[in-house]
Amino acid sequence: MATHSSRSENKDAGEEDELRRRNPYEVLGIPSNSTDQEIKSAYRRMALRYHPDKNPDDPVAAEMFKEVTFAYEVLSDPENRRLYDTTGSEAVGPENEDLELDLSSLGAVNTIFAALFNKLGVQIKTTVSANLLGEALNGTVTTLPLMVGQVVSRKVEKQSAHFYSVTLTEEEAQDGLICKVHSSAKNKFKLLYFDQVENGGLSLALQEDSRKTGKLSTAGLYFFGFPVYRFDHRVNSRALSRDPETGFFKRLDAFQPFEITELKAGSHVFAVYGDNFFKSVSYTLEIFSSAPFGNEKESLRSTEAQIVSKRTELLKFEAEYHEVFAQFTEMASKCTGEVQEIDELLKRRNEICAAYTIFPPTKQGSSKSRSWSKKKSSLLMEPREEGEVAVREEGGVKKKKWYNIQLRQDKKKN
């Protein structure tokens, strides 16, 4: 059994290494300078083709789906893509991947575990149901027509979507369009925009996940005729968790432009996708012209231009920081070495100076003994009157003793 387990582990490791060696751009069939939108479109097209739900009991399709998913995980994350482009596939491993799930394909037990992990803070990215995307691509979904300026409040089931179509005139398209969705219950949802394909089907082109802001969860798509940016806070959190000290420099990596900046006159399709784990999603959708918000649009353009400039400055600052930090580390190490060397030299000098003496070294124990003997003698013998000596005995009682009394001489005189 141990041998079988070892072979299985080696096989899994070999498959993972093979995935790493595959060029993700080649897997998705796109050039290395592809935009985020081109990467997403290629992934969705191939994921639909090789999805296990559409190819049951097909090991070749399952393997291709695994490769396509791995390639997308590398290229869809700005940090992972930069790592791959600069250092190669060996730098991109499982630790850099996000967990991305199609909740519609999970059983009840797996969904419970996914929800639990999400509650514990594990970043779980969810995808739009492959079956739903397939239906949209085949043109079998139902769309509800809306007018510009119309507001709709509804409830959509989990892993399902409501599709809406809006028709723009030339003037409305030129003015710009805003599509916003919010949920007062802070439900999770995705705001989707679809391109129309030749066969009358719909291909997912834009996706914006809801984000909690105050008492609401919101998402928005903006078509102003100039680049508008999105900011994924999850990418910043991952950068900080990987390297808290230098994660600051990657804070704006997730500040990326929307792939579509303007809409042409004609019909356009949006959708709201329920992204809760268990319950339906209550939401309010509004589609309106951006013409009344001319000042806000210019303010947004100016502010985002400053953020983009700051992102460029951060890249330069990061290079300078690493250079200065390396110099500081070297200087700190040198300083520690100098302090140790100085301490050793001073210690050696003190030892040499202590050797310059003509007196022999004394034993500390015998010196203390002699001192105590002298002190004890002085305490025992206390001088009094001539011929009288007070002797202090151990009991503390003093006895007088007389010496040198010439009794015999006194008798002779008498």
From Swiss-Prot:
Keyword Coiled coil: yes
UniProt gene name: ATJ39
Subcellular location, record wording: Membrane
Region called Disordered, residue ranges: 1-36, 362-395
Keywords on record: Chaperone, Coiled coil, Membrane
Database matches in PANTHER family: CHAPERONE PROTEIN DNAJ 39 (PTHR44272:SF5), DNAJ DOMAIN (PROKARYOTIC HEAT SHOCK PROTEIN) (PTHR44272)
Annotated membrane topology: Peripheral membrane protein
Record flagged with keyword NADP: no
Main location: membrane
Ranges of compositional bias, category Basic and acidic residues: 1-24, 382-395
Family per record: Belongs to the DnaJ family. C/III subfamily.
Protein's recorded name: Chaperone protein dnaJ 39
Coiled coil: 296-324
Record Pfam families: DnaJ
Role of this protein: Plays a continuous role in plant development probably in the structural organization of compartments. Seems to be involved in early gravitropic signal transduction within the gravity-perceiving cells (statocytes).
Species in which this protein is naturally found: Arabidopsis thaliana (Mouse-ear cress)
Tissue and organ expression note: Expressed constitutively at low levels in seedlings, roots, leaves, stems, flowers and siliques.
GO CC annotation, single: membrane
Induction per the UniProt record: Up-regulated by mechanical and gravity stimulations.
Source lineage: Eukaryota, Viridiplantae, Streptophyta, Embryophyta, Tracheophyta
J domain boundaries: 23-88
